[in-house]
């Protein structure tokens, strides 16, 4: 008798809500201790044609209609095994059918197992022709994975495509623990579509039902399916109780959406958070529209505005079409300047000063590219501060390298600047910048000689109000032509450190750059897009002091620097330190009296910068950097970070960050640099830590203290319990959320979050500490 005993899979939930990916090794191995494994040789491929072996104490039959096997019945085919006290085999010839219908009844202590499931029950039935199967009052346990439960009746239909449960349950908790379970009056699992439908779904904690839904459709397996995701809740001082219930919508293979009703008790309404993702021939993108119909807190604080709708729109797109066209969108806009102070969003924060709305279309072929873009800014400032937008901007590059020993490039730009205020200057700027360079290099050094010409034309309009209120007058039409000459040389010396550390290698890399740019008075040009560039060691060797084109500082300077690196015997960099300085032969000027240090007439060694990295061991790392600017009469910026990392869940990091008030005034827009909260600069010390404190318990925390204000700048503490069938996470965060100009003090928001994660519904067994650290307002960054 060669017939296949069909595979009996226990339940849709157990087979579908488990994944092998992303398991944390320690906990995963512990959780497998209570899970049975398949210990027979695994048979691969189609087992339909394999023989069926039946062993029993007794057998009798009425050939060809039926046969009865009793006493320790053991039936095997391929990976499947069926054991019972009694098995009845029936065969009946149906009218008009070439093959007889063969069915099996199993009675008493029914035990079925294969490489996927173990099932036990008092009674079972199977149709050997159609593979339809029924099992009554069965207990099931998944093999090699978490998942078990019960069902009054389990049915398999459609060549094992569908598993149907009547009064079925599922839990991923190990045997002996029923901390949580999901129960449904009927459950249909479609393996081909990887979707589960549950009627009268009840979620239980222990024996107590705490959630009910008349119908649920859950995505299962790796195939994207529509359905509800795990809800989340937290409590904050700005919104009180908050609850999230995300729903995932699989619209098409190339697009999907997540719709999240977000209830905020203090706001008295539900914010609808709608995320849409897509993939087209023109690229991939993401759109987010968050909408709050009304906000009673905002209405109380801004009574003149009435019932205000609050919203956020975000659009990010990046794509290439036909290998030559580039499309990019980076667009963020909100209903009001207080939006990110009142609502948490991954598309902005309370520390952001503005939102950007940028669109660009580019065309690129060999040696040539062109981009047309528009850029606008939404400034989050209640002082009605103006801002400039580029509407539109054209950037063109043409390269012709290996022209003999030379490389050449021509860069061109045309842009029209528009201000948000009617009385501010506006301009059209056209810039042309041809460059020729002579690059020379070998394995121990390089020398690059470069010359360029920077020609810029400004046509400025709407100057009446500005010229009437300022001593320096702007000009309607300005032409500025500035040549630039640069020589940049670098050497690399290498030595074996066999005497000190066998197998280690040290390099010494001196670098010298001379830069010359003649002075041109730019006081007749308004500053539309230039700001002081932040400098580290590599920044010392930049051509420009300012970003943008409105301020190009004169230069007659030599930049010198040296870097040393140490590599171990595996060519891993263990240590480096870089120190450099800029020596000015003449004062660097633009003619703009608004730039403070241009009135100091300083020359000599003015700017110093240093960076260092030390990988002390496999677990210890140190990074540090400092910039000193004599034009600011102070250390401009500095930062240090010392980290001990045992693994991704065990780390301690100490941090220090400093920015002088003079540096802030020089780099930030005036409406921020002059604000009260920045008058003393930034001087903060802090620490972040993550560590398991007991079996399955872990803690994560961050604390930053501002020594200028003698107040905490940011605090975060999280505690998590992790087990085989659930995880509980509780978090507290106190973060800076704005500035009260009337009372002249910082505004803080306190948040308490609570999250439960059901194991078996997620493939992640990790402690979640990295996510908690990186979600902080001062996010963790590794020093290793």
UniProtKB/Swiss-Prot annotation:
Disulfide bonds join 31-724, 173-725. GO terms for cellular component: cell outer membrane; transporter complex. It comes from Salmonella typhi. GO terms for biological process: Gram-negative-bacterium-type cell outer membrane assembly; lipopolysaccharide transport. Component of the lipopolysaccharide transport and assembly complex. Interacts with LptE and LptA. Residues 1-24 form the signal peptide. Together with LptE, is involved in the assembly of lipopolysaccharide (LPS) at the surface of the outer membrane. Pfam families: LptD, LptD_N. Contains two intramolecular disulfide bonds. The keyword Signal applies. It comes from the Bacteria. InterPro entries: LipoPS_assembly_LptD, LptD, LptD_C, OstA-like_N. Keywords: Cell outer membrane, Disulfide bond, Membrane, Signal. Its main location: membrane. It is found in: Cell outer membrane. This is LPS-assembly protein LptD. Belongs to the LptD family.
């Amino acid at each position: 008798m060669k017939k296949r005993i069909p595979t009996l899979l226990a339940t849709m939930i157990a087979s579908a809500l488990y994944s092998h990916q992303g398991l944390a090794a320690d906990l995963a191995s512990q959780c497998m201790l209570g899970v049975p494994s398949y210990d027979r040789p695994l048979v691969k491929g189609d087992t339909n044609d394999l023989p069926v072996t039946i062993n029993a104490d007794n057998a009798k039959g009425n050939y060809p209609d039926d046969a009865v096997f009793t006493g320790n019945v053991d039936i095997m085919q391929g990976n499947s095994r069926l054991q019972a006290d009694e098995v009845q085999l029936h065969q009946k010839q149906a009218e008009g059918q070439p093959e007889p219908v063969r069915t099996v009844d199993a009675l008493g202590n029914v035990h079925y197992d294969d490489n996927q499931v173990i099932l036990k029950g008092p009674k079972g039935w199977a149709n050997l022709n159609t593979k339809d199967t029924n099992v009554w009052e069965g207990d099931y346990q998944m093999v090699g994975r978490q998942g078990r439960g019960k069902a009054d009746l389990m049915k398999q239909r459609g060549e094992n495509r569908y598993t149907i449960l009547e009064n079925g349950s599922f839990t991923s908790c190990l045997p002996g623990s029923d901390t949580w379970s999901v129960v449904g009056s009927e459950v249909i699992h479609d393996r081909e579509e990887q979707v589960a439908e549950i009627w009268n779904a009840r979620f239980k904690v222990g024996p107590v039902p705490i959630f009910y839904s008349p119908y649920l459709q859950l995505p299962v397996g790796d195939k994207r399916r529509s359905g509800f995701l795990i809800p989340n809740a937290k409590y904050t001082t700005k919104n009180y109780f908050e609850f999230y219930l995300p729903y995932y919508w699989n619209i098409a293979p190339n697009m999907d959406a997540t719709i999240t009703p977000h209830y905020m008790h203090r706001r008295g309404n539900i914010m609808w958070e709608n995320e849409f993702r897509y993939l087209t021939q023109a690229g991939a993108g993401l759109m987010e529209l968050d909408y709050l119909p009304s906000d009673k807190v905002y209405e109380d604080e801004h009574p003149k505005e009435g019932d205000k709708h609050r919203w956020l729109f975000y659009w990010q797109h990046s794509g290439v079409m036909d290998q030559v066209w580039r499309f990019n969108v980076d667009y963020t806009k909100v209903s009001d300047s207080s939006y990110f102070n009142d609502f948490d969003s991954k598309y902005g924060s309370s520390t952001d000063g503005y939102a950007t709305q940028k669109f660009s279309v580019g065309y690129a072929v060999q040696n040539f590219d062109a981009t047309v873009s528009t850029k606008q800014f939404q400034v989050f400032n209640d002082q009605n501060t103006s801002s400039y937008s580029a509407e539109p901007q054209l950037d063109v590059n043409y390269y012709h390298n290996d022209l003999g020993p030379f490389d050449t490039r021509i860069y061109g730009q045309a842009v029209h600047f528009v201000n948000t205020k009617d009385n501010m200057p506006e301009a059209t700027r056209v810039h042309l910048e041809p460059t020729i360079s002579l690059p020379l290099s070998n394995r121990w050094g390089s020398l690059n000689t470069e010359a360029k010409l920077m020609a810029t034309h400004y046509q400025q309009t709407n100057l009446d109000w500005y010229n009437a209120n300022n001593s320096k007058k702007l000009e309607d039409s300005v032409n500025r032509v500035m040549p630039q000459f640069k020589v940049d040389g670098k050497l690399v010396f290498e030595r074996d450190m066999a005497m000190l550390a066998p197998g280690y290698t040290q390099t010494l890399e001196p670098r010298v750059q001379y830069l010359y740019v003649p002075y041109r008075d730019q006081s007749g040009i308004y500053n539309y897009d230039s700001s002081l560039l932040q400098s580290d060691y590599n920044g010392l060797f930049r051509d420009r002091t300012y970003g943008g084109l409105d301020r190009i500082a004169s230069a007659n300077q030599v930049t010198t620097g040296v870097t040393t690196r140490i590599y171990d015997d595996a060519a891993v960099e263990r240590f480096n330190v870089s120190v450099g300085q800029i020596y000015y032969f003449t004062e660097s000027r633009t003619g703009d009296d608004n730039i403070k240090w241009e009135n100091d007439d300083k020359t000599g060694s003015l700017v110093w910068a240093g960076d260092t990295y030390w990988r002390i061991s496999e677990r210890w790392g140190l990074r540090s950097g400092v910039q000193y600017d004599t034009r600011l009469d102070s250390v401009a910026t500095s930062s240090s970070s010392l980290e001990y990392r045992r693994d991704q869940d065990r780390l301690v990091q100490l941090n220090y960050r400093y920015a002088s008030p003079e540096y802030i005034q020089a780099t930030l827009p005036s409406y921020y640099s002059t604000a009260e909260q920045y008058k003393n600069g930034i001087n903060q010390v802090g620490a972040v830590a993550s560590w398991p404190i007991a079996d399955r318990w872990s803690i994560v925390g961050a604390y930053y203290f501002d020594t200028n204000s003698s107040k905490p700048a940011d605090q975060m503490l999280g505690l998590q319990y992790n087990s085989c069938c659930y995880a509980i996470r509780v978090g507290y965060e106190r973060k800076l959320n704005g500035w009260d100009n009337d009372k002249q003090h910082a505004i803080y928001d306190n948040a308490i979050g609570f999250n439960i994660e059901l194991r078996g519904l997620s493939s992640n067994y990790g402690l979640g500490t990295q996510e908690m650290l990186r979600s902080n307002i001062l996010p963790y960054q590794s020093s290793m």
